[in-house]
């Protein structure tokens, strides 16, 4: 496993966690994620010789930690810009922050399955970068 690459690619999650609080509206957020997933899948396929699916899965799980943390820490600002999501959370048995903390990892796993599939397919289509010769 290339943990350095997983961490580096997960920084898209940190960016999106903050950007979705302040800049990116919910309606267009999926387009950003599609672009990020395609880019991550390509990079994984280029940089990693095998286990593409697992690398994609792990990137999304780490992404979910960044995003969940950002949304919980910036909850007041998140709530001001995402009223529809907050309204949905009000009907849940736990507080909105607790629901975010519980659902964040679930979303990370589900999105990780998607990114994992993208990375697996990219691994079949993209030739990996050859290691430098000594």
Model-identified regions with their sequence ranges:
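Juxtamembrane/disordered regions of integral membrane proteins
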Residues: 1-134
């Amino acid at each position: 496993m290339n943990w350095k690459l997983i961490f580096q690619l997960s920084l898209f999650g940190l960016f999106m966690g903050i950007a979705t609080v302040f800049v990116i509206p919910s309606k267009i957020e999926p387009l950003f994620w599609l672009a990020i997933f395609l880019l991550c899948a390509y990079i994984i396929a280029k940089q990693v010789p095998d286990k593409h699916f697992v690398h994609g899965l792990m990137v999304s799980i780490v992404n979910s930690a960044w995003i969940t943390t950002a949304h919980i820490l910036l909850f007041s600002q998140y709530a001001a810009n995402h009223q529809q999501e907050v309204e949905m959370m009000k009907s849940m048995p736990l507080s909105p922050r607790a629901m975010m903390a519980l659902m964040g990892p679930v979303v990370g796993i589900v999105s990780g399955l998607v990114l994992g599939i993208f990375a697996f397919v990219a691994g079949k289509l993209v030739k990996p970068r050859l290691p430098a010769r000594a």
